[in-house]
């Protein structure tokens, strides 16, 4: 009998629950939506409570208490309905929020990251600036080369035009003159051109002589350096003996004096023959000249002033011929 009564009680209880659910399903749907929007913070608590109630093992005492509450007061049923409707509404709002968050995450994933984009754009812009700067430098170099070439071409053209203009001006200037004066003017121009050519040749010879002299000086400096090194080695050696100092200038003067004496003896009578000066032999200090000697013949004027007039004119004529040859042929006058 106890079992049958408990079965009937359970059936009646399940029927009541179904009725309550049907009634509350229509009325509480709108309330649950508004209530879930206002109070979304209590969702986790009600959910945990409902889950804990469902998971707890049901006993006879728990069933009796529940029956007593439902039969004694209808407030519990209304509270139950409200809590269920709230949990449903909250579940819907949670689903909506979750779907929104998922869609946001999908959008954020689908969108390219701004940092990576900015880095790639910075790299590409850096590469572009590098390539642009290189192109600018290349263009500048090409422009400079073109300008230099144009300047050189302009200078060559100017020189060519100047030469042409000079020849044209000469011809135009000589046209109005008589033939004799034209010949004189042309001869004068030829002489000027020859003089310019002679000056150019002389300058070339001077440059060559200077180059030779520099080479000789370099060679002499090398010889002097070797001699200096040997002298230093001799001084540093143990067999070195200190001697009195003699300057090289005095030795050079003595050599020059001996050369002058040798020239004087050769110009004198042929019977007198002087020995050639030897640089290796030591020169006596008595032979070194200490004063300047002048070759004075007690003459008040130069001997050319005492030449006859015909001889002087002849010499002057020869001098003019030599100068003319120098201007025409470019050969230097002796």
Swiss-Prot record:
<feature type="coiled-coil region">
    <location>
        <begin position="180"/>
        <end position="225"/>
    </location>
</feature>
<keyword id="KW-0539">Nucleus</keyword>
<feature type="compositionally biased region" description="Basic and acidic residues">
    <location>
        <begin position="51"/>
        <end position="62"/>
    </location>
</feature>
<comment type="subunit">
    <text>Interacts (via Arg/Ser-rich domain) with LUC7L3, RBM39 and RSF1.</text>
</comment>
<feature type="compositionally biased region" description="Basic residues">
    <location>
        <begin position="78"/>
        <end position="118"/>
    </location>
</feature>
<keyword id="KW-0963">Cytoplasm</keyword>
<dbReference type="GO" id="GO:0005737">
    <property type="term" value="C:cytoplasm"/>
</dbReference>
<keyword id="KW-0175">Coiled coil</keyword>
<dbReference type="GO" id="GO:0006913">
    <property type="term" value="P:nucleocytoplasmic transport"/>
</dbReference>
<protein>
    <recommendedName>
        <fullName>Serine/Arginine-related protein 53</fullName>
    </recommendedName>
</protein>
<feature type="compositionally biased region" description="Basic residues">
    <location>
        <begin position="35"/>
        <end position="50"/>
    </location>
</feature>
<feature type="compositionally biased region" description="Basic and acidic residues">
    <location>
        <begin position="1"/>
        <end position="13"/>
    </location>
</feature>
<dbReference type="GO" id="GO:0000380">
    <property type="term" value="P:alternative mRNA splicing, via spliceosome"/>
</dbReference>
<feature type="region of interest" description="Disordered">
    <location>
        <begin position="201"/>
        <end position="220"/>
    </location>
</feature>
<dbReference type="GO" id="GO:0016607">
    <property type="term" value="C:nuclear speck"/>
</dbReference>
<keyword id="KW-0597">Phosphoprotein</keyword>
<comment type="function">
    <text>Plays a role in pre-mRNA splicing. Involved both in the constitutive and regulation of pre-mRNA splicing. May have a role in the recognition of the 3' splice site during the second step of splicing.</text>
</comment>
<dbReference type="GO" id="GO:0000398">
    <property type="term" value="P:mRNA splicing, via spliceosome"/>
</dbReference>
<feature type="compositionally biased region" description="Basic and acidic residues">
    <location>
        <begin position="132"/>
        <end position="166"/>
    </location>
</feature>
<dbReference type="InterPro" id="IPR034604">
    <property type="entry name" value="SRRP53"/>
</dbReference>
<feature type="compositionally biased region" description="Basic and acidic residues">
    <location>
        <begin position="201"/>
        <end position="218"/>
    </location>
</feature>
<keyword id="KW-0507">mRNA processing</keyword>
<feature type="region of interest" description="Disordered">
    <location>
        <begin position="1"/>
        <end position="179"/>
    </location>
</feature>
<dbReference type="GO" id="GO:0005634">
    <property type="term" value="C:nucleus"/>
</dbReference>
<feature type="region of interest" description="Disordered">
    <location>
        <begin position="259"/>
        <end position="284"/>
    </location>
</feature>
<keyword id="KW-0508">mRNA splicing</keyword>
<feature type="compositionally biased region" description="Basic residues">
    <location>
        <begin position="14"/>
        <end position="24"/>
    </location>
</feature>
């Amino acid at each position: 009998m106890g079992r049958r009564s408990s079965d009937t009680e359970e059936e009646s209880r399940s029927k009541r629950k179904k009725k309550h659910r049907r009634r509350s399903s229509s009325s509480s749907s709108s309330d649950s939506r508004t209530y879930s929007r206002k109070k979304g913070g209590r969702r986790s608590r009600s959910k945990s409570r409902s889950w804990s109630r469902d998971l707890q093992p049901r006993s006879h005492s728990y069933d009796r208490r529940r029956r007593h509450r439902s039969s004694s007061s209808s407030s519990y049923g209304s509270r139950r309905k409200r809590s269920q409707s709230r949990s449903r509404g909250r579940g819907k709002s949670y689903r909506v929020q979750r779907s929104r968050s998922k869609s946001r995450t999908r959008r954020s994933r689908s969108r390219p990251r701004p940092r990576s984009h900015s880095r790639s754009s910075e790299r590409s812009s850096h590469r572009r600036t590098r390539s642009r700067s290189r192109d600018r430098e290349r263009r500048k170099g090409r422009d400079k080369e073109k300008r230099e070439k144009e300047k050189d071409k302009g200078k060559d053209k100017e020189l060519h035009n100047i030469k042409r203009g000079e020849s044209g001006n000469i011809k135009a200037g000589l046209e109005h003159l008589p033939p004799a004066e034209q010949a004189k003017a042309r001869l004068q121009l030829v002489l000027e051109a020859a003089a310019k050519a002679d000056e150019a040749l002389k300058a070339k010879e001077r440059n060559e002589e200077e180059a030779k002299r520099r080479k000789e000086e370099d060679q002499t400096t090398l010889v002097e350096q070797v001699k200096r090194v040997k002298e230093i080695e001799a001084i540093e050696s143990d067999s070195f003996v200190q001697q009195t100092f003699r300057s090289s200038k005095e030795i050079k003067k003595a050599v020059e004096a001996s050369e002058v004496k040798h020239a004087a003896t050769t110009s004198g009578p042929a019977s007198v023959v002087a020995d050639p000066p030897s640089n290796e032999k030591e020169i006596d200090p008595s032979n070194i000249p200490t004063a300047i000697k002048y070759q004075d013949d007690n003459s008040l004027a130069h001997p050319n002033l005492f030449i006859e007039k015909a001889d002087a004119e002849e010499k002057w004529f020869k001098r003019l011929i030599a100068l003319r040859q120098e201007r025409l042929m470019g050969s230097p006058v002796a």
